């Protein structure tokens, strides 16, 4: 792989991906949600409490919540962490090579229907509680938590479910887009279009709509300036995530879903040149987000302060997510790899967990 410079020395740094200095946010000091979220998944049968690797898997996922939502209280953190744990478990399941197309599609359709209808879903309505598959139990738990938080705000619940289902319906198309061979790569523009949804920023920012009573109209989520901001922010998410996962995805022969690899193959350029191109794009997109922040607030200057405050909360949260994702990615064991071309994530660590091998289908799916 073209990840090392001459003599095997690392030559790339993720510090070239810069955010404005004023975008500096602390990590949420509350960490009690981590063990509580893990225990809920254990109760549903997703994990085994006695299995150390299961806890490490869960812990590595849930730590991101503290980086994403530094202002959340415990109850809000529990909402966000249950969403994130559900997402990662489902994503890791769908990306397994031994899960055929039919089972993947069945899984997606089933999750969608349970989120929409709950216990009335035709997939589980005739199954006793004790006989439900672990992931079904956890999906019901998640839906119940979301419903309780939005019991007087049905519109906000529907908006969040919309973004959530958009995400999990993007997983299979992205996987299929690269062709039959694992090393194939999709056209870059096609990849960017699918990955904008698949990277997950839309549903992550929409967690605020469930966890926080923002006092804003549902129509705000369709505002073209806000839509452009979140689309551009999704691109920033993608660049960071693809950089830190580059070596791992090449190692697992699934780099056809990685923007660095796609640009290398399609443009026949060395990794360093491709990375410099992405750094330039990153800087340009950050500037666009800053410009749209001003435009967005100006376009709503007629609203009462209560609603303006809700919009300002979301804008700040968007920036917290961007910075939090970047900082978390640099320290998460999920992205450590001995062949990483980036100094910050390249090392051999005996404690690093091969996440793709931890959860077997019989543990969390029947």
From Swiss-Prot:
Keywords (A to Z) from UniProt: Lyase, Metal-binding
A single GO molecular function term of this UniProt record: metal ion binding
Species assigned in the record: Dictyostelium purpureum
Taxonomic lineage from the root: Eukaryota, Amoebozoa, Evosea, Eumycetozoa, Dictyostelia
Function: Terpene synthase that converts its substrate farnesyl diphosphate (FPP) into the sesquiterpenes bicycloelemene, beta-elemene and 2 yet unidentified sesquiterpenes.
Keyword Metal-binding attributed: yes
Domain notes: Contains several highly conserved motifs that are important for catalytic activity including the aspartate-rich 'DDxx(x)D/E' motif and the 'NDxxSxxxD/E' motif, both of which are involved in complexing metal ions to coordinate the binding of the isoprenyl diphosphate substrate in the active site.
Name recorded for this polypeptide: Terpene synthase 4
Motif DDxx(x)D/E motif per UniProt: ranges: 91-96
Enzyme class: lyase
Reactions accelerated catalytically: (2E,6E)-farnesyl diphosphate = (1S,2S,4R)-beta-elemene + diphosphate
DNA repair found in the keyword field: no
Motif NDxxSxxxD/E motif positions after renumbering to this chain: 241-249
Protein family according to the UniProt entry: Belongs to the terpene synthase family.
Cysteine disulfide partners in this protein: none
The EC number(s) this enzyme carries: 4.2.3.-
Domain of life: Eukaryota
GO BP annotations listed: terpene biosynthetic process
Pfam families noted in UniProt: Terpene_syn_C_2
């Amino acid at each position: 792989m073209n990840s090392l410079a001459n003599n095997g020395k690392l030559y790339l740094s993720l510090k070239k991906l810069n955010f404005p200095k004023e975008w500096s946010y602390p990590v949420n000091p509350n960490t009690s949600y981590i063990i509580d979220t893990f225990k809920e998944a254990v109760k549903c049968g997703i994990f085994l409490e006695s299995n150390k690797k299961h806890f490490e898997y869960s812990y590595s996922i849930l730590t991101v919540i503290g980086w994403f939502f530094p202002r959340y209280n415990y109850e809000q953190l529990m909402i966000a962490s249950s969403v994130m744990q559900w997402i990662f478990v489902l994503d890791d399941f769908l990306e397994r090579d031994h899960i055929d197309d039919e089972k993947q599609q069945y899984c997606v359709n089933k999750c969608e229907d349970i989120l929409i209808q709950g216990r009335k879903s035709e997939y589980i309505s005739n199954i006793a509680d004790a006989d439900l598959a672990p992931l079904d139990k956890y999906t019901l738990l998640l839906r119940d938590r979301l419903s309780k938080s939005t019991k007087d705000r049905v519109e906000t619940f529907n908006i969040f479910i919309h973004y959530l289902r958009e995400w999990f319906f993007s997983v299979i198309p992205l996987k299929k887009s690269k062709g039959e061979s694992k090393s194939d790569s999709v056209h870059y523009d096609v990849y960017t279009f699918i990955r904008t949804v698949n990277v997950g920023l839309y549903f992550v920012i929409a967690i605020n709509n469930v966890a926080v009573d923002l006092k804003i109209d549902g129509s705000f989520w369709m505002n073209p300036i806000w839509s452009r901001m979140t689309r551009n922010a999704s691109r920033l998410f993608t660049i960071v995530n693809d950089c830190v996962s580059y070596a791992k995805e090449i190692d697992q022969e699934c780099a056809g879903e990685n923007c660095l690899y796609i640009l290398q193959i399609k443009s026949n350029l060395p990794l360093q040149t491709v990375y410099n191109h992405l750094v330039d794009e990153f800087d340009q997109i950050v500037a666009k987000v800053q410009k749209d922040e001003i435009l967005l607030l100006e376009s709503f200057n007629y609203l009462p302060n209560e609603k303006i405050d809700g919009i300002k909360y979301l804008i700040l949260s968007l920036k917290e997510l961007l910075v939090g994702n970047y900082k978390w990615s640099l320290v998460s064991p999920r992205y450590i790899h001995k062949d990483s071309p980036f100094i910050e994530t390249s090392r051999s660590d005996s404690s690093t967990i091969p996440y793709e091998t931890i959860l077997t289908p019989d543990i969390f799916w029947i």
